[in-house]
C-alpha cells in the first residue's frame, strides 16, 4: 500500500533516488532541502518518477508548516554532529511528532564520530559534540532503536532507526 515519507536534508539526492525507486506506486514523498541549487536537481529527479507524488520544499525543516497528515517514515540526512544540541533536540522532536503511531525515523551518522570527538581538544566544541551524541543515544534507547552499518558509503555510515 502507498505510504507517506518525509526526507529531510536531501542534498544532491542519493537517498531521494533510492526512495523513488523503492516506494510503492501512489506513495507521497515530501523532500525538505534548504539549498535552492539542490532543490532544482531534486525536482528534476522527482519528475522521472511520476508514479510517486513528490513535493520538494526549498527550506529548513523548522520552516515547514506541520502537516495534518503524518508520515509513515522519515529519513534524515542532516549532519547532527555539527549542530548545536538544542537544535538537534528540537529537530528530532519535530520529526517524531510528525510520525504516525508505529512510524519510523531513520538518520545517518558517520562511523568514526566517536573517534573524532575523542581527538577534539577539550572545550566548547567537544562538549557540544558529546551532548549531541548523548541525546541521540538516549532517544535511540528510549525508542528501542536499531543500528546497521553502510560500509559501501564513503566514509562508512551508520543508519539508526527508531519506531514510535
Report each predicted region and the residues it spans.
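Glycine-rich SAM-binding Motif I of class I
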Residues: 13-17
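Conserved SAM-binding strand-loop segment of SAM-dependent methyltransferases
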Residues: 50-61
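Conserved SAM/SAH-binding beta-strand->alpha-helix loop
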Residues: 35
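A short SAM/SAH-binding and catalytic strip from SAM-dependent methyltransferases
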Residues: 72-87
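Conserved class I S-adenosyl-L-methionine
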Residues: 2-11
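A short glycine-rich, Lys/Arg-flanked "PGG" loop and its adjoining helix->strand segment in the class I
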Residues: 89-101
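Class I S-adenosyl-L-methionine
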Residues: 126-164
Amino acid at each position: 500500500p502507498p505510504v507517506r515519507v518525509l526526507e529531510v536534508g536531501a542534498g544532491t539526492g542519493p537517498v531521494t533516488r533510492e526512495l523513488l525507486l523503492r516506494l510503492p506506486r501512489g506513495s507521497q514523498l515530501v523532500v525538505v532541502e534548504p539549498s535552492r541549487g539542490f532543490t532544482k536537481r531534486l525536482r528534476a529527479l522527482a519528475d522521472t518518477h511520476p508514479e510517486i507524488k513528490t513535493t520538494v520544499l526549498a527550506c529548513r525543516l523548522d520552516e515547514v508548516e506541520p502537516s495534518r497528515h503524518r508520515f509513515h517514515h522519515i529519513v534524515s540526512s542532516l549532519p547532527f554532529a555539527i549542530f548545536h544540541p538544542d537544535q538537534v533536540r528540537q529537530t528530532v522532536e519535530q520529526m517524531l511528532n510528525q510520525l504516525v503511531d508505529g512510524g519510523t525515523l531513520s538518520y545517518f551518522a558517520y562511523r568514526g564520530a566517536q573517534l573524532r570527538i575523542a581527538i577534539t581538544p577539550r572545550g566548547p566544541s567537544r562538549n557540544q559534540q558529546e551532548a549531541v551524541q548523548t541525546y541521540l543515544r538516549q532517544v535511540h534507547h528510549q525508542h528501542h532503536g536499531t543500528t546497521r552499518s553502510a560500509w559501501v558509503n564513503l566514509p562508512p555510515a551508520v543508519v539508526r532507526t527508531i519506531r514510535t
